[in-house]
Amino acid sequence: MRLIRRIRAFVPGLIAAQILLGSGVVASADSASANSSVAKSQTRIVLAGGCFWGMEAVFEQLKGVTNVVAGYAGGDASTARYEMVSTGSTGHAESIEVTYDPSRVSFGQLLAVYFLVAHDPTELDQQGPDEGSQYRSEIYYTTTSQKNAAESYIQALTAQKTFDAKIVTRIEPLRAFYPAEEYHQHFVARNPDYPYVVINDLPKLAALKRKFPDMLKS
């Protein structure tokens, strides 16, 4: 576990250097707008559940999902940078902003993938080898209907005893979402052989194909 954490911690410097060599520019969360432009026919939800690499990779596979952005939620703009968020002291959670078309994929379907594939909702301030409040399980809703649906879904999972342990997922209104640095975006797709990805994220994609094959993009 310690080795895996060190592998992930090494990524910013490694990939940032690659980006610098390739384009001369590294995107900053501070330079990105906290509010996404979403078409009227679409809506968005922000989900936190451990490392945003795997979360992003899972939701990018779904029909009706038009965009997924890795980023930070739950904290302030001034500290929405990976080197600060990774300390676990800024109040942020590594998150993804999912933009989707409700006529093609329901919020309930997104919740099913979130709870049953993308992360373990019973782990408090931790997901797999990653520990700290920045890896917490949290849903940031943008509408009251999302809030009510998320609460009902958790109640149903609890009543059905889907998990052996208590679900610790928090549900909070979205105050702001800050896109992460460019080297974090689409990380799994660009680095499928990276050790952390192979160990922690590819199994999630395999589980998604096994559990929800009809929800996948062709």
Report the location of each language-model feature:
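Flexible coil/turn and secondary-structure edge motifs
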Residues: 2-8, 12-218
